Each structure stands twice: as structure tokens, then as C-alpha cells.
Amino acid sequence: MPLVEKRYAQALLELSGSDINSIKEEFGDFTNLYNSDKDFRDFLNNPVVKTDKKQALIRSVFTDRLSKNMLNMILLLVSKHRTAEIPGIFNQFIQMANETANVLDMKIIMAAPMDEVQLETLREKFKKKYNAVAVNSTEIVDESLIGGLKVIIGDKVYDGSVKGRIESLTEIVSV
């Protein structure tokens, strides 16, 4: 993640205090609107439109819908011309909030679909390994793995796929 996104996310996390869950929800709703409404997104990212007009629109539409901290964050992003980074800041915020709450985010990439019992067993093993309170997982089927699976947690990759083993052997043989 770019440093800018990380800094804004960290600032919002510090401002959130005990309201972290409501900020998560508000920021998520705003980000969904930003991502889904092309006209709104184009308006906020348009360099020709004056900052005060953008802020006036944000205030008129969101003053009653967002908390003071969230509204001020959006207004700050508008004034600093950082609205294009809203999705990245949101993703970084969620990641930091989960780390603070000791929630493990993991991506499970498998060659073939796994049943829910297998997935839950895998989640539980990583939950214990990382001493996490809870686990959020995203499951993806990627047939190019040939067999097995890959688990990604932050920057760490656990590769138990056939494709990964073939690539490792190829590296050893070619050296």
C-alpha cells in the first residue's frame, strides 16, 4: 500500500477511538457509493471543479449521515485532492483496524473448491497459530495451482500448491 493511504488510514484509526465499528461502517458505505457511482467519483476527482464546490456537496449530502470525524476526513481528502485514494485508504483502514482488534485477514487460494468443514479447520489452525480473536477469510478457486492450496496473510505466503512445488524444483534444477 502506498504511504499516503497508510498515513490517512492511521490518522482515521487514531481519531476513531472507541467508535471504530461505526467508522468502519460509515467509511464502508461511503466507499461503496464512491466505487459504484461513476458520476459522483468523477465529480470528486475532477480537477476543474473547485474544492469549495466539492466540499459544499459533501456537507449538504453527508452532514446528517456521517459522524463528525468521518465527515471531516472526507472533507480533508477533498481539500488535499486525495479522493482518488479513498478505496485504498479504506482497505488500509480495515486492515489496521483488524490488526488492532487482533482479527486475522487471510486469503485462501485453492485448486478446487473445499467444503465448509475443511475451510473452518484451516481457519481455526491459522487462528491458533496467530493467536487471533477471529478470522476473516476470502476463498478463491484457481485451477492453475494444479492441486493443493495457498494461504496469504499480510505479506506472508504459505504455498502448499503443486504449482508452487514445481516452481521450487525448477529453481533448484536451473541453478
Swiss-Prot record:
Keyword Kinase recorded: no
A cellular-component GO term for this protein: plasma membrane
MF terms (GO), sorted A to Z: proton-transporting ATP synthase activity, rotational mechanism
Membrane topology recorded in Swiss-Prot or TrEMBL: Peripheral membrane protein
Record's keyword terms, sorted: ATP synthesis, Cell membrane, CF(1), Hydrogen ion transport, Ion transport, Membrane, Transport
Localization in the cell: Cell membrane
Domain of life the protein comes from: Bacteria
Pfam families assigned: OSCP
Broad class of where this protein is predominantly found: membrane
Annotated InterPro entries: ATP_synth_OSCP/delta_N_sf, ATPase_OSCP/dsu
Known partners and oligomeric status: F-type ATPases have 2 components, F(1) - the catalytic core - and F(0) - the membrane proton channel. F(1) has five subunits: alpha(3), beta(3), gamma(1), delta(1), epsilon(1). F(0) has three main subunits: a(1), b(2) and c(10-14). The alpha and beta chains form an alternating ring which encloses part of the gamma chain. F(1) is attached to F(0) by a central stalk formed by the gamma and epsilon chains, while a peripheral stalk is formed by the delta and b chains.
Family: Belongs to the ATPase delta chain family.
Its job: F(1)F(0) ATP synthase produces ATP from ADP in the presence of a proton or sodium gradient. F-type ATPases consist of two structural domains, F(1) containing the extramembraneous catalytic core and F(0) containing the membrane proton channel, linked together by a central stalk and a peripheral stalk. During catalysis, ATP synthesis in the catalytic domain of F(1) is coupled via a rotary mechanism of the central stalk subunits to proton translocation.
Protein name as catalogued: ATP synthase subunit delta
Species of the source: Ruminiclostridium cellulolyticum (strain ATCC 35319 / DSM 5812 / JCM 6584 / H10) (Clostridium cellulolyticum)
